Amino acid sequence: MARWWGGEGRGGSGTPVVVKMESPEWAISEVEAGAAAPGSPAAGGKAGRGKNARQITWVLLLKAHRAAGKLTGAASAALSVAAAARRRVAAGRTDSDDAAAAPPGESPALRARFHGFLRAFLLLSVLLLAVDVAAHAQGWHAVVPDLLAVEGLFAAAYASWLRVRLEYLAPGLQFLANACVVLFLIQSADRLILCLGCLWIKLKGIKPVPKASGGGGGGKGSDDVEAGADEFPMVLVQIPMCNEKEVYQQSIGAVCNLDWPRSNFLVQVLDDSDDAATSALIKEEVEKWQREGVRILYRHRVIRDGYKAGNLKSAMNCSYVKDYEFVVIFDADFQPQADFLKRTVPHFKGNEDVGLVQARWSFVNKDENLLTRLQNINLCFHFEVEQQVNGVFLNFFGFNGTAGVWRIKALEDSGGWMERTTVEDMDIAVRAHLKGWKFLYINDVECQCELPESYEAYRKQQHRWHSGPMQLFRLCFVDIIKSKIGVWKKFNLIFLFFLLRKLILPFYSFTLFCIILPMTMFVPEAELPAWVVCYIPATMSLLNILPAPKSFPFIVPYLLFENTMSVTKFNAMISGLFQLGSAYEWVVTKKSGRSSEGDLVSLVEKQPKQQRVGSAPNLDSLAKESHPKKDSKKKKHNRIYQKELALSFLLLTAAARSLLSVQGIHFYFLLFQGVSFLVVGLDLIGEQVE
């Protein structure tokens, strides 16, 4: 055996194998491939035993080296996270210290009350945990002490607490838990039905097809764009932007390169920037494309009210808009493909009742960090399942605010853009639906854009997306009831579109998993079954991740992060429903038919240089008058989010209490969910600012 292990085979000594461990990237397959050396069994020799054994030894050593490298990398990553957390705590910068970090429209008083409630709940849970640990040490977890037979103040107090818990707290808590479970099951059934609808669409190959393939439909005659210019309808392209210094060039360039007759489309760059330097850069970019022969205009409002809705409304009031049949909207970070109009506008031909054609979003930075990966999962499900199913079966869905083509007649018939909510896109979609207009969703037409890379930006976006629908529901509920659409469409709008998907979802997510579940740990007489805590949420997460199969490794972080975001969504839903926060009240300013801004550019001129010299100083002087003391650009910071941090400690405390009740699944869920809240509370997800 010693001779065999030493490589002294019967046919002679084996060839020594040298493996340099300094190169951990060296493939194991290279070692295994080199086994068939002269004299080895693979080569027909009998002296390969010793050599093969030695190679196996070295391969095992190489694998161990690789494993050690991976462990070192994991340890390094853990140390980096710990160092970032330590810096965050040492800096002491919280979301309450900086008003700019709070979501727009969030009431400071509401935020303070909500945070106070969470802190009080946390202190109470810590106290109850201490009491339960002391009682567990006395053995009272196995035998409930008799109130009449106990001796000692603590024993009497604990026996009284058990009685109050059993007779007064448990029934009410169990009722709330059962109610939330019912809502959870209803929402899960809705999600399952949407997935089945998407599966049916895939199996049947259902998708909108233009009735006519000529002209803009991409038919044989569409290759020669200029020759068939008469068949291409007039299209107005709008790019609303505000201080979009980073992306204005790519969005304007992508729109100006659209494959459409230049005489048949006009680009409006709607600049609401309050920074004079940014406005000058955008204006210069517009003039550059004007010199290239593109029909493009630059608009800058003097009175910037109504945010995006006000900007779009002002642009639609221009007198030349009456010459156009369709309007396309692209946000400043969107980059449409050259054939975007050819693949969307033809769907209107022969469908006079179609008011909107919506394209899908794709994301250029979906793999930037964990936050963008999780956002990609959510939005892939939104477009692939929700939008597609609602478009095919109901001809209605929420307009996404960009990458969509509107029939101008439908916009005007629905009342145009309104500044009454923070979700002007959903507002116009609901009003158009009440007027009887149909929507088409084109899943195979994609438009690239960017995802928020920092948690602060994502938090603000989600707050607006979940407060606005509740505002809109309050404003249009009576209009829905009085409208002439069918009963089923009214039911879909009220109960599915608004209540179930915009109100019930954030309500039960936060209440059930962040409040009721921890409470059941301290009041164990009220129970939440394991299938509610683990199995059904895992199944729903699996369904959500199916449209983005490459994101399957992130299914657990996705489930935990969605529950973490329920705090922001719940707070936003309450703010919008009860109109909390002064920023929600937008003043509606009516506009005249023709804009009178001094720096509004007219149609394309032959001498753009004179136009630039004459208008740029006016823009600078206007900016100086409006903002005489312009602050320098604020630096970005990572900060501590107090509500998320308080909830993390609450859930971790409840996880510790679940160990006393020997509830394994509940313990692991609370532990991982508490860690998830801790990571988000310390702003360790998303962009890290050094």
From Swiss-Prot:
Active site: 272, 425
Localisation per UniProt entry: Golgi apparatus membrane
Name under which the protein is recorded: Probable xyloglucan glycosyltransferase 1
Primary location class: Golgi
GO terms assigned for molecular function: glycosyltransferase activity
Membrane topology: Multi-pass membrane protein
Keyword set includes Magnesium: no
Residue stretches in coiled coil: none
Enzyme Commission no: 2.4.1.-
Gene3D superfamilies (alphabetical): Spore Coat Polysaccharide Biosynthesis Protein SpsA, Chain A
InterPro entries: Glyco_trans_2-like (IPR001173), Nucleotide-diphossugar_trans (IPR029044)
